[in-house]
């Protein structure tokens, strides 16, 4: 195994992580992804280095799981708004979120054991845009109301 490439997409932004043997391989992969239909932008985080071990990748998966659990536990964040990838102890975080959510999520992730660095790849939206994305809560049921005879 000479190449290890992860392709993660969120809202037409593509994140490339992993390891390739040469700069030429790195540029070839980026060029291929940039030509794909509906790709708005490519974030190239491919490292020119030997491929990481299976145990290193497994450790990254554990860290990603811890991050997701921490986002779920956070009361002021909607965990599904974030896509998280961990590669070599660097957490890459994608999402369409408000500045408040981006800052809060970054603080949560920085405190997760095993995270050495956080790379923010957010599309920042306004609080008003967020309100428009979230469906209104259903009206409360009137338990005391009885059908009229």
Where are these regions (language model features)?
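N-terminal targeting leaders
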Residues: 1-149
